[in-house]
Amino acid sequence: SEVRVVNFTPEIANWSPAAFVERMISPLQPEHVLVGQNFRFGRHAVGTPQALSEIGCGRFEVHAMDLVAISGVTVSSTRAREVVAAGDVAEAAELLGRPFEVGGVVVMGDQRGRELGFPTANLVLPEGRAVPADGVYAGWLEPGSGPDAGRRLPSAISVGTNPTFDGVERRVETYVIDRDDLELYGVDVKVTFAERLRGQIKFDGIEPLISQMTDDVDAARQILA
């Protein structure tokens, strides 16, 4: 099998339905094309599954698949992005058929987590990347290399700007539970979200923050056990 990723550009958006078929689909020489019942293509989204079949002129067979609904809500990428943005990673997992995850290379942070007793692996994600709402989550970190490569390590994950320290850059900071020995700078990692624990809070000082972080880690440990 082969997967081809095509960047959706203004030029492609301006193609007519016929141009879309001739330039995007025909070169692949498919025998069957599977689309959703609500599939639309071509300029102003005027192309439909029926139009796709007509333009194909018998060169391939078009199958319009039934839409999937969960609790009466149609499963779609739009809906998945909405629940991720709201921090509902449990519903996101139900819609996606797998837990929501992000990935990237661990970068040097402010070292505050280490000073507080909770060293974190920090990811700065590109703008536009889907990220759960600011808050704290239970989940896993999986290193792509090193002694723990491929292992899912139970973690407490913070998403946000560190308002207690007047931070402005939005980050994903992951504390691997009971593993203060990890050296992850420069390592490509995958962070998987299991359950939301709470929203982001601005604390009045270090002690309340440490107390809450301790509670968060305990809660994450229990959820992931």
Where are the regions a protein language model picked out?
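Short, well-structured secondary-structure segments
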Residues: 2-7
